[in-house]
Amino acid sequence: MSNIKRMAIVLVAVALVALVASSFKGSDVLDRSIILGVGVDAFGDYGIQLTVEVVSPGNGSEQVGTFSKTVTVEAKTISQDIQNVAEYTGKEASLGQCVVLILGQDYYENVDFTDLIEYFINHHSLKESTAICCCEGSAKDLLNNGGALAQSVSLAIATAMLDQTEKIAVSTNNLLKYTRSQNELDCTGFLNKVTFVPSENKDAQDSDKVMGYFTYRELAVFRGNRYVCDLNEEEVRGMSLFVEDVVGETFVSYQDEYKRTLQVNNKDVEQKRTDNGGFDITITISVRFGRTDSEEVSGILSSKKNDEIDPKLLDDVQQQAMQLATAFLAKQAEYNFDLLKFHESYRQKQGTSDQLAHKPTADFPVNLTIKVEEN
């Protein structure tokens, strides 16, 4: 390699280092508390306990690899809490890099949190794409746990929620989508319910910190920012069948005494209004065998993608899918919420009216058809 090329590489490397360094100059990390995640819990009578995960770069006096720390404050309003974070840390609290907002169970089950949502959606620096969820137990405890890979809890949860739709076949939400749902005719929306599952692993730097992983298999339903009910795993799977861009769902069936796993890799959902004030809904899902694709291992475990699927397996998947979808529809009718936007669909046709706004979800008859085909 010529000296000129070597010099060019050195200059490029120096430029990259300078660019990265400039993005973390004193006005950022040193002068501001960069918040990665926000947890909200109930505090006293109508108060709010706020727990934030803030960036904490390691230095000579800290443990090697320290990435973030949590700060907990209490106040009567969310704006006072944010001010208290600034006073506690001695730095301006910055929400520009916040990736997740978590509502604790005692808070979201008992409080109309409209003011909280309005504060965050109108905050000039918080991104509308910020993930929003709720959790089992307190948000403070959740943020003080350790993820399976010992990374930031906020980043771990936000990353999982961004990947849920494509990889784990569960609908997810962000701040903008949730806020819009609460301003539609039926004011119905949902939040993913995060649960921490402890493991026997220990943090090498903090032996007292509980390590584990997070699950997202349940949802909490809200109307007008007030809690309605939870959806269990079966009902969540049923709801996801109605969402066209949610794929990856797996079904297990038996063939010749062997378990066979079929995975949904394509879906078409057609929802039409009917003359009797209801809906005809047709869900067509395409499936294929779900197997490990390990062609790089000399073909020993390579996926046989051309295997034909026995029609009996397709029938079994259809029955399972119908059971899941029916369970969700029954829950929606029982608790009178509308995640399938039945009210909004008829509002677009008939216009807004008090009669439509107060129409029970159970009064929309649904004719459901599910088709399963091999991809």
Q: What do the PLM-derived regions correspond to, one by one?
A:
Residues 2-375:
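Membrane-proximal alpha-helical signals and transmembrane carboxylates
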